[in-house]
From Swiss-Prot:
It comes from Thermotoga petrophila (strain ATCC BAA-488 / DSM 13995 / JCM 10881 / RKU-1). Its cofactor is [4Fe-4S] cluster. Keywords: 4Fe-4S, Iron, Iron-sulfur, Isoprene biosynthesis, Metal-binding, Oxidoreductase. Converts 2C-methyl-D-erythritol 2,4-cyclodiphosphate (ME-2,4cPP) into 1-hydroxy-2-methyl-2-(E)-butenyl 4-diphosphate. GO terms for biological process: isopentenyl diphosphate biosynthetic process, methylerythritol 4-phosphate pathway; terpenoid biosynthetic process. It catalyses: (2E)-4-hydroxy-3-methylbut-2-enyl diphosphate + oxidized [flavodoxin] + H2O + 2 H(+) = 2-C-methyl-D-erythritol 2,4-cyclic diphosphate + reduced [flavodoxin]. This is 4-hydroxy-3-methylbut-2-en-1-yl diphosphate synthase (flavodoxin).
Length: 344
């Protein structure tokens, strides 16, 4: 089991549940917009939020932001050690730095500030920060991250989170497998510069999913260009699919000419309405009753289309026939019954 660190009220590592992170896209000093975006991320299920700190104005904004949010905040600093210290002084729950960009004396100052507040430091590497280059780039990536760790250890600092990220899936997997054998610190997983839409989802799901199945990884961020809320939704779905997080899983048939309902939109509507449920339940959306009920019998709850309506079934047993406009309402009714049953 990996050692644990505490980020605000969230524990990373040490057998704690894998947490879902994201990063704001706003200018941090724009406090109102940053808080608004973080609140949207909180509602989606984000558990740790990271903000970019590029100047003193950003660092000083952290205190005001923290007053209005519920989740821990991580300050991301690239070069200036003074911004790291200022972020810590203003209440950051964790900082992310690159120790290799700082002199020994300046790193000592940052470490002293972090120790004084009892907060962890995240270090690591991506392909842009590789210190040496050989024919095995994944290993260069991992060794660069380990060098960052050693710099902190030399200063007597051990509340560390480590990340190694590449835009290449195999490099990300190999590098994380390598460092998992070398250190006991918690590992932050992600695929950097993963891209947009489906490309980012596919790459992140493969790399993060593979590593989590091997029991590697303690916190995740799914990088998707655009609205960060989608990062959180996909991250939670990865954990639910792997059985690492409770929640509603919606399964749906791929549709064919027999479909009597709009399977895609129905499934999306159900996901949106039941995404908040924190119980392990499976809901099936099947286009027809020909194979639908049989294929969806493993679901806790389901709907199958009819020419003039739909049938609702619970654990493979048909409960009632309804018109299409009442499907969601009746599903909610049976879902509440299932939730009451689970609570008993």
């Amino acid at each position: 089991m990996r050692k644990s660190v505490k980020v605000g009220n969230v524990v990373i590592g040490g057998g704690a549940p894998v947490s879902v992170q994201s990063m704001t896209t706003t200018k941090t000093a724009d406090v109102e917009r940053t808080i608004s975006q973080i609140k949207r991320l909180e509602r989606a299920g984000c558990e740790i939020i990271r903000v970019a700190v590029q100047d003193e104005e950003d660092a000083k904004a952290i205190r005001r932001i923290k007053e209005q949010i519920e989740i821990p905040l991580v300050a991301d600093i690239q070069f200036d050690y003074r911004l790291a210290i200022l972020s810590i002084d203003n209440g950051a729950d964790k900082i992310r730095i690159n120790p290799g960009n700082m002199s020994r004396d300046r790193l000592k100052d940052v470490v002293a500030a972090a120790k004084g507040k009892g907060i962890p430091i995240r270090v690591g590497a991506n392909v842009g920060s590789i210190k040496r280059r050989t024919s095995e780039r994944w290993k260069d990536l991992a060794e660069s991250a380990l060098e960052e760790v050693r710099l902190l250890e030399k200063e007597g600092f051990y509340d560390i989170v480590v990340s190694v990220k590449s835009s290449d899936i195999l490099e990300t997997i190999k590098a994380n497998e390598y460092i998992a054998e070398k250190i006991e610190y918690p590992i932050h997983l992600g695929v950097t510069e993963a891209g947009v839409s489906e490309t980012a989802v596919v790459k992140s799901s493969i790399a993060i999913g593979h590593l989590l199945l091997k029991n590697i990884g303690d916190t995740i961020r799914v990088s998707i260009s655009g609205d960060p809320v989608r990062e959180v939704i996909v991250g939670k779905k990865i954990l639910i699919a792997l059985g690492l997080r409770e929640g509603v899983e919606v399964i749906a048939c791929p549709t064919c000419g027999r479909a009597e309902i709009d399977v895609e939109n129905m499934a999306k509507m159900i996901e949106e309405n039941f995404f908040h449920v924190q119980k392990r339940l499976k809901i099936a959306v099947m286009g027809c009753v020909v194979n639908g009920i049989g294929e969806g019998k493993d679901a806790d709850l389901g709907v199958a289309g009819l020419r003039d309506g739909a049938v609702i079934f619970v654990k493979g047993e048909i409960k009632e026939r309804v018109s299409k406009e009442f499907v969601l309402e009746r599903l909610k009714h049976y879902l509440n019954e299932l939730l009451e049953e689970v609570e008993r």
